[in-house]
Amino acid sequence: MAEYDKEIENIVDLDDDDELDLVALVSANANDTSQYLVFEGSDGQFYAKNVSKIEELLVYKDIDIARTHSKDLIIGTADIRGNMTTIINFDKWFGNEVLDDSEYELIILAHYGGHRLGIVVKRVEYIVNVPPETMTDNSDNDEKTSFITKVTIGQKKEMCLIFDSDKMLLDVFNTIDTKAMEDTKKIREIKNDKTVLFADDSRFIRKMAESLFNKMGLKYRMYENGQLLLEDLKYITPEEIALFITDLEMPVLGGRDVIDTIRRDKKYDGINIIVHTNMSNDNMVDSLLKAGAQDIIGKVNMLALSESIQKLMV
């Protein structure tokens, strides 16, 4: 992995004995797309999840769980603040050794893609700032990871894997993919000779979007990050572009930078932008709309995405 010129600085050292502090720390950073919660797996490897997808952190032993007796990755279901929430073990999902239950300290309560999910982890370390330019795509090496980066923990540089949250959702809630395919069958072809430019680092999302675009009869180009999309603009005239669709959380260059760059160039003023992301909350939606996006669609609602495409294509 290449050495980075820009230092990744720790924002705060989490005190995992104090649940209230943990909740406050996550909440304070929930609108920043470059903030990640770092935790340790049973293998000693560090993993990370974007804080915008996290509602709060809970002490595992304090949560009453109706446990399943199956051998899959789902531990059971818990009533968390009035919401029945699926609880899974991160190590089991990722393929690591599963430790004794007493070794696990916290539940990361995530809410994205229209689902709440409690992710049981061994220990949380830090909230860190991870700029997109310091991330390297790692999905070819492990389909459950999106990027690899380095973070500073205890004055030492450590490798950190940012896992693919979309893949986790598809694995846990296996009806999502089926529903997306069923929704795609309802979609009709539309007539438009222009090209949709679509950027998303997740191979699973790109595959689903490709199926959607083919069903709609659209011309499209796909990119694994925002930088590749912007570089390709040198070879496409504005008159050829029907629409921009971008994820937010991507390596090298994220979706917010894509929006800002496009909106600074007046020749793209008449072309709409859809943000397709699991990272949206009310404050973030407002921020993206002010930055120049026309719509924010949550993953993985292919029907909603198709409707937005039909409405916003030029």
Annotate each predicted stretch with a short phrase.
Residues 274-276:
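Hydrophobic/aromatic residues positioned on beta-strands within the core alpha/beta folds
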Residues 239-242, 267-272:
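His-Asp phosphorelay/catalytic-motif detector in bacterial-type signaling
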Residues 256-269:
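Short amphipathic alpha-helix used as the core "switch/output" element in two-component signaling
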Residues 1-239, 244, 248-257, 278-314:
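An acidic, low-aromatic, low-complexity terminal/linker signal
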